[in-house]
A protein has these predicted regions:
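Anion-binding alpha/beta catalytic cores of soluble intermediary-metabolism enzymes, centered on
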Residues: 1-175
Length: 175
C-alpha cells in the first residue's frame, strides 16, 4: 500500500506498507523480497525509502520466533540491499518517533524516520494500514501487487469511487 496524507505545508506525507493483503505468513526470505520490491515501488512514488522491519521488539528487547524472523529478515535484507537504509527488528514507535528512537536505537539512521514499513504478517499489515487510513487520515492506495510480470492491483471492498479511479491511474503508471 501507498499511503498519502496532505500536510499544512503543502507537501504530502507518503508512506509505503507491506505486506497488507497477499502473503499470510511470509518467511524470512519472502520478507527480504517484499522489502526490496516495496522500496523500489516507494521510489516510483517519490519516497526515499527508509525501511523498518516491524516487530513488538526493538533490537532484542523482546524474545520469540516472530522477533527472530524479523531480525533475521532485516539482516538478510541489509546484505542483499547494502545501499538501502534498513532497520529491524524495530517497534513502530521507534521507527517513526525521533524522541523514542534516540532512546531505543540511537545509532540507527532509519529509526525515527522510517517511511517504508515491512510487517511480520498479513494480520499486522492489514490492521496497520487500516488504522493509518481511518484514524490517521491517510488515503490508502492498494494493494499494489509487486513481483509480477505486469502491473495488477486490487481494491478493498470498503473503497470509494475516488480510490477506484486512483488505483486505475496507479496501475497505468506502473505499466
Amino acid at each position: 500500500f501507498i499511503l498519502v496524507r496532505p500536510s499544512a505545508t503543502g507537501e504530502n506525507e507518503v508512506l509505503a506498507m507491506s505486506d497488507c493483503a497477499i502473503n499470510i505468513h511470509p518467511t524470512e526470505d519472502e520478507l527480504v523480497e517484499i522489502a526490496g520490491e516495496s522500496a523500489e515501488c516507494a521510489k516510483i512514488f517519490g519516497i526515499d525509502p527508509k525501511v523498518a522491519f516491524l516487530s513488538y521488539s526493538t533490537l532484542g528487547s523482546g524474545k520469540g520466533e516472530d522477533v527472530d524472523k524479523m531480525r533475521n529478515a532485516a539482516h538478510k535484507a541489509r546484505e542483499k540491499y547494502p545501499n538501502l537504509p534498513i532497520e529491524g527488528e524495530i517497534q513502530f514507535d521507534a521507527a517513526v518517533a525521533p524522541r523514542v528512537a534516540r532512546t531505543k536505537c540511537p545509532q540507527s539512521e532509519v529509526a525515527g524516520h522510517a517511511n517504508t514499513f515491512i510487517f511480520p504478517d498479513i494480520n499486522a499489515g492489514n490492521i496497520g494500514y487500516k488504522i493509518a487510513q481511518r484514524l490517521g487520515n491517510f488515503e490508502a492506495y492498494g494493494p499494489i501487487l509487486l513481483g509480477l510480470n505486469a502491473p495488477i492491483n486490487d481494491l478493498s471492498r470498503g473503497c470509494n469511487a475516488g480510490e477506484v479511479y486512483s488505483m486505475a491511474i496507479i496501475t497505468a503508471a506502473l505499466a
